[in-house]
Amino acid sequence: MRILFAGTPSFAAHYLSVLINSPYKVVGVLTQPDRAAGRGNYLATSAVKQLAIKHNLPVFQPEYLHENNGKHIIEHISVDILVVVAYGMIIPQDMLMFPKLGGINIHGSLLPRWRGAAPIQRALWAGDIKTGITIIQMDDGLDTGPILYQVACKILPVDTSTTLYAKLAKIGSTALLATLKQIITGSQVIEPQNNKFATYARKLNKKEARIDWQLTANQLERCIRAFNPWPISFFKIRDTIIKVWGAQIDDINYHHIPGTILSVDPVGIKIATGKGAIIITQIQLAGTKQMPVKDFLNSRPTWFIPGNILE
């Protein structure tokens, strides 16, 4: 089986690695164009491109896909199937007609829940107790195709997007290889999605990561875990951005204005929220490494004063 792989971030690179080390042949890689990144605005290549180059695979980086350039790529390298993981660009329906076996998409949720760009983060953000990997036959919709394979995993109260990515990558590897085997043997079972249960996982943005103290402590703690490793929850004090990497919930309702600093000690900074309080335990200043609150307080003991109200 000759595979054209389409993907961009490290989550996708994991699946490319699985395919490279499988009995199947990866004949080419589609990934997003190199983008300017960082303070120096340097040109950054995707994790998928880096892995492809390491294994001497042809790399295609069109600014956008349409029928003609998609057809050219597939015909040029003779593709049996297109495998898509977090590519980040819409695959035109016409392009799916060119591979002999069509295209499949590996998605990080239990579809039809959390269709869209950020399914792993939105599952944490919403307080879901489980998620999973769904492999679908691609159609002209956004994550709407019929289900070929689905496997679930628990979301633990301590999970972040980082840990959940790792869990899903592990179970997804087995799911991908099993699906390809079923396609080859013609034994796959196709199940249409029930659109009645569909939800949308909109893309994350940095503005969303700013902590809103009006939310409940439970909601804020979930946001902090969901936005790790990006965009990282933050708040401002003394016109300085403080990123929050770890927090705990205090369910007691203190009846203070949300954002009020309730107490400060080496364990954490307790702050009133819309309901309950959040205890911030792990923080980071710009240009420094993340650190326990006690280390921050040792060098800046007057930054957090009980009774003061944060923005």
Swiss-Prot record:
Matches recorded under HAMAP family: Formyl_trans (MF_00182)
InterPro entries listed in its UniProt record: Fmt, Formyl_trans_C, Formyl_trans_C_sf, Formyl_transf_N, Formyl_transf_N_sf, Formyl_transferase-like_C_sf, GART_AS, Met-tRNA-FMT_C
Source organism phylogeny: Bacteria, Pseudomonadati, Pseudomonadota, Gammaproteobacteria, Candidatus Palibaumannia
Keyword flag Nucleotidyltransferase: no
Gene Ontology MF terms in the entry: methionyl-tRNA formyltransferase activity
Broad enzyme group: transferase
Keywords of the record: Protein biosynthesis, Transferase
Function: Attaches a formyl group to the free amino group of methionyl-tRNA(fMet). The formyl group appears to play a dual role in the initiator identity of N-formylmethionyl-tRNA by promoting its recognition by IF2 and preventing the misappropriation of this tRNA by the elongation apparatus.
Organism, as annotated: Baumannia cicadellinicola subsp. Homalodisca coagulata
Similarity comment: family membership: Belongs to the Fmt family.
Descriptive protein name: Methionyl-tRNA formyltransferase
Cellular component per GO, a single term: cytosol
EC number: 2.1.2.9
Catalysed reaction, written as an equation: L-methionyl-tRNA(fMet) + (6R)-10-formyltetrahydrofolate = N-formyl-L-methionyl-tRNA(fMet) + (6S)-5,6,7,8-tetrahydrofolate + H(+)
Domain of life from the UniProt record: Bacteria
Cited Pfam families: Formyl_trans_C, Formyl_trans_N
Binding sites annotated in the UniProt record for (6S)-5,6,7,8-tetrahydrofolate: S109, L110, L111, P112
